[in-house]
From Swiss-Prot:
Protein name: Large ribosomal subunit protein eL31
Recorded GO CC terms: cytosolic large ribosomal subunit
Keyword Cytoplasm: yes
UniProt similarity note: Belongs to the eukaryotic ribosomal protein eL31 family.
GO BP annotation list: cytoplasmic translation
Cellular localization per UniProt: Cytoplasm
Main subcellular location: cytoplasm
Organism taxonomic ancestry: Eukaryota, Metazoa, Chordata, Craniata, Vertebrata
Gene3D superfamilies xrefs: 3.10.440.10
InterPro entries from the UniProt entry: Ribosomal_eL31, Ribosomal_eL31_CS, Ribosomal_eL31_dom_sf
Stored SUPFAM superfamilies: Ribosomal protein L31e
Quaternary context: Component of the large ribosomal subunit.
Domain of life: Eukaryota
Amino acid sequence: MAPTKKGEKKKGRSAINEVVTREYTINVHKRIHGVGFKKRAPRAIKEIRKFAVKEMGTPDVRIDTRLNKAVWSKGVRNVPYRIRVRLSRKRNEDEDSPNKLYTLVTYVPVTTCKGLQTVNVDEN
């Protein structure tokens, strides 16, 4: 690596270590296109998990039971096209765990996903 030039800021700590909560709309339909009927809902759960790992940068992802019920609400074949989720990056209380942070994925019930964008949610 080249030495830092005069006037350049030094890199601070990574934003991945911050505790943060965001709401996303996931287009499940495009992620399970071409998947066989009996594997659609299980694949949707796997794709939501993959999305959370990519967005939050934590390999430890925990999916809420309400989100699981929402994905399975129309059966194994007819998964909802879009689903609104809240991704919360949290500190791991378990000391012997290899990961300092984990991501909790919860379901956000909405009537329609039209016009919704990714938003940061304030911690309450």
